[in-house]
Amino acid sequence: MSVQVSYKKQTLLGVLILLVIFAVFEIFAQIYQIDEDTSCNFVKSEVYRNIPENILIGMCNEYHKIKLVHNSYWQIYPDQHYEHVNINSFGFRGPEISMEKPADTFRIFVVGGSTTFGSAATSDDNTVPGYLQKKFDMADLGLNVEVINAGTVGAYSKTEAPFVKDVLFDFNPDLIIVFDGWNDVWISYTSHIDERGVEGQLYDVVRDLHDIMPYYKTPFVIRDIAMKNKNTFSGTWDETNLDKKVSLWVERWDEACTSAQQKDIKMFVMIQPILGTGDRIITEFEKTNLVEDEDFILVPIALEKYADVLPELTNCTYKADLTHTFDNHKQTIFFDLGHVGDEGNMIIAEEIYKLVLPVIQKS
């Protein structure tokens, strides 16, 4: 009898010790994750030097709250509303829209990653699609032009091309603008071909656990330790497979353009500017983002390969290289390798407007 009691006490003691260990580790994990959860590069950036820091921190917190649907399209959960960012009932950033296109309306979707979504924009109107909408609102074209922000954080051609064909076509768009390139360059080739291995599986498990238990941080620390604190979704820079990634990019968008033609939908594929592209002299603040990691220096060079193969998109009537968009701008534009603030979004939108306006007038 006493032996059984002893076993029970030992078992109970063992459980208590494990609980204490888990609790201590979770406390450490919570402290470790504070900076991860609340930091945004734009808060201390010259890009927003005239905006109070408390407002920028509020923006940062809102962007961290945005939830994604972890499907093959990397869509955004619908109906998320904050002060600086709003997601409508279809999962697009900005105001509500109808599935059915209104009469006398030229409907445009802008597809891309976080730079299209506007991960540092001070409002929905100050994203690239938002500024583009303002430009068309001021134009006298004899019809309504509707610009819809279909950008999603982390999106690249592997997720975007199916998203265009399977989801956006149902909204009867007249034009779909593809504004990307950076994510395709940076994301590992293994992610492009669905061979992410143990690292990718661990990333997915931690992500799914976070959806179930959003306040439990231990899995994140374990993941970062196992992955040596690398971006496990994007992987590490792999220049050896760059040509293969470029080929996949061409294949995906050329196929999407073919499908669009069959539905009388126009596609306009654009290569985005990032820090280091074009002939612009970067500022001292921006320079720190290039020199802190040797991989960063190679990314803008790699992006040029995507611009070089634009002519190979034979089924895409419209394509453009926007990597020189900021050539004549001396002020700080980027707060990291590819993200810009409101001013950068406005400059990009003005360039896109000049390219798209003739397409609408021709239509």
Regions found by a protein language model. Give the residues of each.
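Second-shell loop/turn segments in exported
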Residues: 115-123, 149-150, 240-246, 296, ...
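N-terminal Sec-pathway targeting helices
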Residues: 2-19
